[in-house]
Amino acid sequence: MTGEVQAKVALATKAELRAAVETAKAAQPAWAATNPQRRVRVLMKFLELVARANDAMAELLAREHGKTIPDAKGDILRGVEVVEFALGIPHLMKGEFTEGAGPGIDLYSMRQPLGVVAGITPFNFPAMIPLWKLAPAIACGNAFILKPSERDPSVPMRIAELFLKAGLP
């Protein structure tokens, strides 16, 4: 904790935000049409990449945020646990059917992606909260725009890079 600047990241302009929304809108239909099992494979690959990058991410988080290394690893682990939960989302996406809900009435529900969703995350858990928001949304077929805290954006940006490497469009 030296107080030294660790990195400088420019704030997004309104035009950049609009471009991000338009890009997400354009990508979302194809992602939603990707079957849930294939979407989950991206999460599985992401977990593999995070496991390899865990120590470096914890060190980055500790330098930028001021957490201890064990606390930083815990922040990442709690986020990873939600990604692991999201691996089961294909089962949850099946919907329901009720035959004979009333005379001549059958009921069914279908679960569908919402579209473009966003996560605005706080500074105090820069790995955990983005993963809590991002993984379920992605597994369900949504496009996701992440707005990390300007106080410690490096780990959320690294998470985004790892998702790209894992195959997220």
Model-based region annotation:
Residues G3-M93:
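Glycine-rich loop-to-alpha-helix module at the N-terminal edge of alpha/beta enzyme cores
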Residues G95-P169:
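Rossmann-like NAD(P) dinucleotide-binding subdomain of oxidoreductase/dehydrogenase enzymes
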